[in-house]
Amino acid sequence: MKGTPFRSPHLYQEGSSCMHRTIRSVAAVLTVVLSATIPMVPAWSDGEPRSIQFWWPDHLDLSPLRQHAAESDPLGANFNYIKAFQTLDLGAVKKDIAVLLKTPQDWWPADYGNYGPFFIRMAWHGAGTYRTYDGRGGASGAQQRFEPLNSWPDNANLDKARRLLWPIKKKYGEKLSWGDLMVLTGNVALETMGFKTYGFAGGRTDDWEPDLIYWGSGAKFMSNNRDKNGKLEKPLAATQMGLIYVNPEGPNGVPDPVAAARDIREAFGGMAMDDEETVALIAGGHTFGKAHGAASPSKCVGPAPAAAGIEEQGLGWKNKCGTGKGPDAITSGLEGAWSADPVNFTSQYLDNLFGFDWVLTKSPGGAVQWKPKDASADQLVPDAFDASKRHPPMMFTTDIALKTDPSYRKIALSFQKDPEKFKAAFARAWFKLVHRDMGPRSRYFGPEVPKEDLLWQDPLPAITYKAVDEADITDLKQKILASGLTVPELVRTAWGSAASFRGTDKRGGANGARIRLAPEKDWPVNDPQELKKVLDKLESIQTAFNDGNHDGKKISLADLIVLGGNVGVEEAAKKAGYPVTVPFAPGRVDAVQAQTDVKSFAVLEPTADGFRNYYASSNQLSPAEMLVTRASMLNLTVPEMTVLVGGMRVLDANEGHSQLGVLTDHPGVLSNDFFVNLLDMSTKWSKAADTAGVYEGHDRKTDALRWKGSTVDLIFGSNSELRAVAEVYASDDAKEKFVRDFVAAWNKVMTLDRFDLQRQ
């Protein structure tokens, strides 16, 4: 579950106050002429079902928890992509790609006889949707194949790039995912044009349905993604709807390099790129290829793939002007190349940027761009198809921004002065771009994986000791029980450690024990004062064990935190009359502060965690909506979310010891009391008079106050789908089932980042 859901051609607006699901036909939504902004308006066909949110927009949407079901995968539940990929002869694949790059096809000719620049753009735009605020987007899943990305204005004509690659995909089949193939092709393109890449890691599994991610509140492509204060709306990274980063003509099409620099810094920063990485990527990427604007997009270009006729077979942007391809190709409407050698890696982009004075002009397609003031540059660039023609180089407004912004200018000049520095910076920035969404290095596979640990990969130390055995685990459990730590303290700490995980980009989780490091140790949701108390006691247990004579066996604090949570759950289950053993697999390690980028980890901080009844007032979405968002990040299903909330409440595991939703007379006992008491019709619920978001449950006969609950608590009785699941767990015969299901869901969360176990 990588993103917000997409089921059928319906748009799910996560960012609206009620996460409205708006029903629209794909044809109406995605009929877009490249440079035009077509309103996205509702359109219905007879017989099309309306969603619940169509009739009741405030109704909680649970579809994020039903996304990417196993039933959608044609390869089957038993298929292991990693094992299949590891049987691949990567060298042979790269040779096949290299041949394809220089084998032009009549149906879509190659500029300068080389598809390399085209495929770099494909790989870049596939990976460039990643955004650090929520970890969504990126190359994994190959979402560029699906709506809406396959029909975004910024992805115009990349449908042809993927079709050109089909013979390679067809040849290697299930051994090579589209996600890996597109990134690998970008690497091979760079390498065949004289650039040494930093490396390549495989392991991206493909999705089989679109992610329906919140891309902005605008109802038109190219609409502004900024809020009323001019700030880029979080969690977005692109400045305008339908773009990967920024408008190359300038903000909202205005050719202002200074304003463009601000947009670039904000957009690239939202994808975890600093100024040096940003300049390296722009300068490196624009070393190659050309822009395409032979004529006006609005006059010549047809609908995007999602709105094209069925006979087009998934292709879009059909160009009716001239031959519609090659020298007549239209993509962005901008036209021209940045350098005189667009199919080889050089420093010409930087030389031209600083070597000429640039003036505004317009492309044949009517787009605003820049050309050298000096007429001597008019014959500098060869034509992509006709050797007898020459052209001046061109620049986008966003290129000129690198010259005008003081920080970007300083970096760009240093790259121009030192080409080796430029190469190294571009190699590392490109590697980060196309691997940023893959998570830690333990998820990297293949012979070209770099050996170096990079800070943005959230590195972990290697295990240098023997793992504890069952006897050791039993002994450690007894020591935890004797420590004086309570069930709620143990459960809260383990949950805080493990539930930092994001299924979107595979960051966070219990491995590394980063809950003891900045910034996690200071997050309000983790109750810093209590957390320190718990960690101090667990560390003393760890030290005593590791200093003892255990034949080289040691326990990490990361493992001990999870084991402590398990002990708490087991004790609570035993008190309920259902003794269980929570699964535990040692193997976690402890990161150090030097391996933990505070700024990078700050975006993982939960502003709401319904499982601990925590909600910060700064949130734009409701507590119930934020619960679903958090559950989707944890890859949970509706039943798993339900049983975990009910269990966490009776375990008294709320943040700050809040008693909201602790609907039991026996806190610390793993009973189904939360559901029994929530659904008890002898209790009447009403809004609390003094506190927004708090509800009071009074006895219907005596009016005595029984309970207090939050929106998150009451949603399990209010929402019809959640109530149906809650009724299962509230039933008299469900007490043991509740315990078993809670333990299974708990163990799932505790092991979300144990990629080693998942591969087994």
Swiss-Prot record:
| One annotated GO biological process | cellular response to hydrogen peroxide
Q: Which organism is it from?
A: Granulibacter bethesdensis (strain ATCC BAA-1260 / CGDNIH1)
Tell me the name of the encoding gene.
Answer: katG
The family database entries (Pfam families) matched by this protein are listed as: peroxidase (PF00141)
What is this protein called in UniProt? Answer: Catalase-peroxidase
Keywords of the record, alphabetical order, are: Heme, Hydrogen peroxide, Iron, Metal-binding, Oxidoreductase, Peroxidase, Signal
- Membership in a protein family: Belongs to the peroxidase family. Peroxidase/catalase subfamily.
EC supergroup of this enzyme = oxidoreductase
UniProt xrefs under InterPro entries = Catalase_peroxidase, Haem_peroxidase, Haem_peroxidase_sf, Peroxidases_AS, Peroxidases_heam-ligand_BS
Subunit organization = Homodimer or homotetramer.
Q: Which residues form the signal peptide?
A: 1-45
User: Which residues does UniProt mark as catalytic?
Assistant: 125 (proton acceptor)
Q: Which residues are involved in binding heme b?
A: 286
The task this protein performs is described as: Bifunctional enzyme with both catalase and broad-spectrum peroxidase activity.
Question: According to its UniProt record, which cofactors does this protein need?
Answer: heme b
